[in-house]
């Protein structure tokens, strides 16, 4: 191997006849095809074949050694890959960069010279800072000096417009919040009132449940707690007559009281007959005890009524007197004491007293305490451990609770009636002048009316009035007029309920007058706009105030004529002054008649014609006053009158011909009909 290597040298060797030619380096734009002796087609043009601005390279120096070095360090590419497509681009297509460039490129400068939100001086224009304005320590002078110190007139005007918009938006938000809070307050008040009634009902039900539970417990503890009057108070009524109907119950109670009057002497003096009064329990015989020694004093009998407690004493009947019935009972009952249940207190004496003898002496006793003189009496049952005591105490408690509940219901009903009167009167002070309607308010608090097939009370009417008040306050004229029409139709349909009809009509008429005042004021302010005038007149006609609308409109037009005529200044030229005055009068009259014909109903046109004639008469007064210095029939006089008649011919466009009235009695008219002021041509 060494010998072979020694024979190979770069400087020596056999001379070759055909030396390879090494060309200069060139840029490769396509894979070099394998040298297989076959002619290859020229590669297609690619992106690399585009013309390039390359600098020409000087030809390398030739030589044997340089050719060998170039051959040694040359590179040869292998075969092409199997998936190579010579017709495809050597690199993927570039994405569209235009959409990325648009985000970076700003908007073109405006015509005013502002670029990028900067002012004309290359600074940002002043902006309204809401946080600074909300600062409690806000100093207006300092803020204006800092923000608008270097601002231009246009920037100050824009800043002022921004402040006005902010103020308008804040005012609108404040007004919306006020009426929203008022609506919520009304809704909450209604819910609170409804909840109050439900709580009152719940309380009554709980008291009734407590009473029934106590009565059931007493019935379970005692086998005989029917509370009948005994054999001597038998009314002779059968079980059928004791049904729970109101008529039978009233008859039963009346029979009980008659039996009580017959059996207890003097009881009618303490307990006069009244509706609903009846006997709850005949407690049977009792013994009155001394308060100090607890010794027996006399025999008594206790009767419990639904509102009183009657104590009757037992006395021996005299049988030796004239007319005495020997077959009757040996004793009689005489009414001794009687108290109202709410004036006394019944106390169970069990647990008090001396129990050294085995059984407590007061175990079967009760104490009745109270009355007008704050006295106390002790009563004990004749039989020890008599169940009448327990039954009497339970019945007294039950009766007292029922009595208090009935009184509370009556008091609540009275208060509710007063609240109803105060409620309606406070909302509409005008009701205080309606004495007849005010007296019936307590009767209509629960009155129901039919609205669209549903039963509604008058509080629903009040809610509609609240909505109407809100519409009027917000100057929402169309919803307010529609609601008034609905309520008027509702009131007219209540022919069988005159109280509710008068109540609704009174409230609707009051708000209707208030709304009409608002629309009339708007009509006077916008009488020059025919579209607004027609809208306002339509509202007033729907409200029933067409006469008021006509008077307000014609009066406003008369004021316009007076105002425009006073603006005509007399500067020495009588003909020019008469021309101006006549043009003002007849042009305004013509426009008024045109607007009146399109806005008001046709039957009212006669009022407009009458008004036009009055204005022509007022013009004649002015004309006569101005021509008083001119010779009647002269050139100046004739020219002025003819000019006035020429302007009066404009009324023929609206169907009026007042040319014969112009200049009539000019030489004698000196006053304005109806007291209207006459223009003197003075500034």
From Swiss-Prot:
Q: Which UniProt keywords are given for this protein, alphabetically ordered?
A: Coiled coil, Cytoplasmic vesicle, Exocytosis, Protein transport, Transport
Q: Which GO terms describe its biological process?
A: exocytosis; Golgi to plasma membrane transport; protein localization; protein transport
Q: Where is the composition biased (Low complexity)?
A: 219-228
Q: Which Pfam families match?
A: Exo84_C, PH_EXO84, VPS51_Exo84_N
Cell location: Cytoplasmic vesicle, Secretory vesicle
For region Disordered, the annotated ranges are 1-91, 103-125, 217-242
**Matching InterPro entries:** Cullin_repeat-like_dom_sf, Exo84, Exo84_C, Exo84_C_1, Exo84_C_2, PH-like_dom_sf
Q: Which Gene Ontology cellular component annotation is one that this UniProt entry carries?
A: exocyst
Primary site of residence:
cytoplasm
Coiled coil (residue ranges): 145-213, 388-422
Which domain of life does the protein's organism represent? Eukaryota
Quaternary state and interactors: Component of the exocyst complex.
Q: What does this protein do?
A: Involved in the secretory pathway as part of the exocyst complex which tethers secretory vesicles to the sites of exocytosis. Plays a role in both the assembly of the exocyst and the polarization of this complex to specific sites of the plasma membrane for exocytosis. Also involved in assembly of the spliceosome.
Which family does this protein fall into? Belongs to the EXO84 family.
Q: What is this protein called?
A: Exocyst complex component exo84
From what organism does this protein derive? Neurospora crassa (strain ATCC 24698 / 74-OR23-1A / CBS 708.71 / DSM 1257 / FGSC 987)
């Amino acid at each position: 191997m060494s010998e072979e290597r020694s024979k190979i040298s770069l400087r020596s060797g056999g001379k070759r006849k055909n030396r390879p030619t090494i060309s200069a380096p060139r840029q490769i734009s396509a894979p070099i095809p394998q040298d297989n002796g076959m002619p290859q087609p020229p590669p297609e043009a690619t992106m690399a074949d585009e013309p390039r601005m390359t600098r020409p390279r000087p030809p390398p120096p030739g030589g044997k050694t340089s050719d060998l070095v170039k051959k040694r360090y040359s590179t040869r590419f292998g075969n092409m890959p199997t998936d190579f497509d010579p017709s495809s681009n050597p690199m993927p297509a570039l994405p569209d960069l235009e959409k990325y460039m648009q985000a970076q490129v700003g908007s073109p400068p405006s015509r005013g010279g502002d670029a990028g939100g900067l002012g004309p001086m290359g600074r940002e224009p002043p902006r309204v800072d809401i946080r600074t304005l909300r600062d409690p320590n806000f100093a207006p002078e300092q803020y204006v000096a800092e923000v608008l110190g270097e601002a231009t007139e246009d920037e100050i005007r824009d800043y002022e417009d921004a402040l006005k918009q902010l103020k308008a938006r804040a005012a609108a938000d404040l007004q919306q919040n006020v009426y929203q809070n008022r609506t919520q307050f009304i809704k909450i008040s209604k819910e609170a009132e409804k909840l109050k009634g439900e709580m009152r009902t719940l309380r009554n039900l709980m008291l009734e449940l407590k009473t029934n539970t106590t009565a059931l417990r007493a019935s379970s503890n005692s086998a005989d707690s029917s509370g009948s009057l005994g054999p001597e108070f038998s009314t002779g009524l059968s079980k059928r007559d004791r049904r729970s109907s109101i008529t039978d119950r009233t008859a039963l109670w009346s029979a009980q009281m008659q039996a009580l009057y017959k059996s207890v002497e003097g009881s009618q003096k303490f307990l006069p007959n009244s509706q609903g009064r009846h006997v709850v329990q005949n407690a049977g015989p009792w013994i009155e005890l001394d308060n100090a020694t607890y010794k027996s004093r006399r025999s008594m009998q206790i009767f419990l009524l639904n509102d009183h407690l009657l104590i009757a004493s037992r006395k021996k009947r005299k049988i030796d007197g004239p007319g005495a019935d020997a077959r009757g009972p040996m004793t009689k009952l005489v009414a001794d004491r009687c108290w109202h249940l709410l004036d006394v207190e019944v106390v169970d004496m069990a647990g008090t007293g001396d129990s050294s003898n085995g059984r407590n002496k007061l175990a079967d006793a009760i104490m009745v305490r109270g009355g007008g003189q704050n006295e106390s009496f002790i009563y004990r049952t004749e039989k020890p451990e008599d169940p009448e005591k327990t039954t009497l105490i339970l019945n007294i408690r039950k009766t007292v609770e029922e009595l208090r509940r009935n009184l509370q219901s009556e008091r609540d009903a009275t208060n509710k009636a007063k609240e109803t009167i105060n409620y309606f009167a406070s909302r509409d002070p005008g009701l205080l002048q309606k004495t007849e309607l005010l007296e019936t308010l307590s009767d209509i608090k629960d009155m129901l009316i039919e609205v669209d097939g549903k039963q509604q009370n008058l509080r629903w009417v009040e809610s509609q009035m609240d909505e109407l008040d809100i519409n009027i306050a917000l100057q929402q004229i169309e919803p307010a007029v529609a609601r008034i029409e609905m309520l008027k139709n509702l009131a007219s349909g209540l022919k069988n309920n005159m109280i509710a009809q008068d109540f609704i009509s009174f409230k609707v008429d009051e708000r209707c007058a208030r709304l009409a005042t608002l629309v009339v004021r708007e009509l006077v302010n916008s009488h020059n706009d025919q579209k607004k005038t027609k809208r306002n007149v339509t509202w007033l006609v729907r409200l029933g105030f067409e006469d008021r609308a006509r008077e307000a409109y014609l009066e406003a037009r008369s004021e316009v004529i007076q105002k425009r005529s006073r603006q005509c200044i007399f500067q020495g030229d009588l003909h020019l002054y008469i021309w101006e005055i006549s043009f003002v009068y007849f042009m305004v009259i013509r426009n008024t008649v045109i607007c009146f014909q399109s806005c008001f109903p046709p039957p009212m046109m006669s009022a407009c014609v009458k008004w036009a004639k009055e204005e022509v008469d007022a013009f004649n007064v002015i004309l006569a006053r101005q021509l008083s210095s001119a010779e009647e029939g002269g050139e100046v006089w004739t020219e002025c009158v003819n000019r006035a008649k020429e302007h009066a011919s404009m009324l023929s466009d609206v169907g009026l011909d007042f040319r014969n009235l112009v200049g009539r009695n000019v030489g004698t008219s000196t006053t304005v009909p109806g007291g209207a002021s006459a223009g003197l041509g003075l500034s």
